From Swiss-Prot:
Residues 9-25 have a biased composition (Gly residues). The modification N6-acetyllysine is found at residues 169, 191. Component of the signal peptidase complex (SPC) which catalyzes the cleavage of N-terminal signal sequences from nascent proteins as they are translocated into the lumen of the endoplasmic reticulum. Enhances the enzymatic activity of SPC and facilitates the interactions between different components of the translocation site. The chain crosses the membrane at residues 87-107, 112-132. GO terms for biological process: protein targeting to ER; signal peptide processing. It is found in: Endoplasmic reticulum membrane. The keyword Transmembrane applies. Keywords: Acetylation, Endoplasmic reticulum, Membrane, Transmembrane, Transmembrane helix. This is Signal peptidase complex subunit 2. Residues 1-25 are annotated as: Disordered.
Length: 226
């Protein structure tokens, strides 16, 4: 039992911090842990099929969103998505009303209500098309930067992107809208997706994150100067 206790003590010592070298290793480990707790972008590497354009674009979009939300601590605003969901909900409401009314009042008695619901549904689909084309555009993130003093309105950061079919050029645009002056500034880059993915289809954040940070910092510097 004594030998087991000694052995256990040695195991516990090696698991903790043994000597100067152990103390150094312990400190490094806790520092790294603190960094990962602060910014967990690299926790789960993103791996996709490089030949699937939608998967490539979605993975790049999601990772760019994470940089703004996790690294810069901005707060996501879901207003654009809520608007689209509201339009879709109203459209579904007309479809459900038509279904229930036709069940309760079989055709042709239900004809006027069915006609109204069908017309209303297609009108809402038209509104949805206009909304996604001219309001949402290709924006996939709207984030707010709170004013530390609480005196000025929030600054708004928007991310939008494009990747044409059968093309390897990915364009990411970052838009800054000043909460105080309402002035709008933009910065963007266009790069080959091969720069951001390795041969197995894993997104290399060490190559992608600096590009996003460079866009952000260029607009943030202009903001401070003005």
């Amino acid at each position: 039992m004594a030998a087991a206790a000694v052995q256990g003590g040695r195991s516990g010592g090696s698991g903790g911090c043994s000597g100067a070298g152990g103390a150094s290793n312990c400190g490094t480990g806790s520092g790294r842990s603190g960094l990962l707790d602060k910014w967990k972008i690299d926790d789960k590497p993103v791996k996709i099929d490089k030949w699937d354009g939608s998967a490539v674009k979605n993975s790049l979009d999601d990772s760019a969103k994470k940089v703004l939300l996790e690294k810069y601590k901005y707060v996501e605003n879901f207003g654009l998505i809520d608007g689209r969901l509201t339009i879709c909900t109203i459209s579904c409401f007309f479809a459900i009303v038509a279904l229930i009314w036709d069940y309760m009042h079989p055709f042709p008695e239900s004809k006027p209500v069915l006609a109204l619901c069908v017309i209303s549904y297609f009108v809402m689909m038209g509104i949805l098309t206009i909304y996604t084309s001219y309001k949402e555009k290709s924006i996939f993130l709207v984030a707010h930067r709170k004013d530390p003093t609480g005196m000025d309105p929030d600054d708004i950061w928007q991310l939008s992107s494009s990747l044409k079919r059968f093309d390897d050029k990915y364009t990411l645009k970052l838009t800054f809208i000043s909460g105080r002056t309402k002035q709008q500034r933009e910065a963007e880059f266009t790069k080959s997706i091969a720069k951001f993915f390795d041969h197995s289809g894993t997104l290399v954040m060490d190559a992608y994150e600096p590009e996003i940070s460079r866009l952000h910092d260029s607009l943030a510097i202009e903001r401070k100067i003005k």
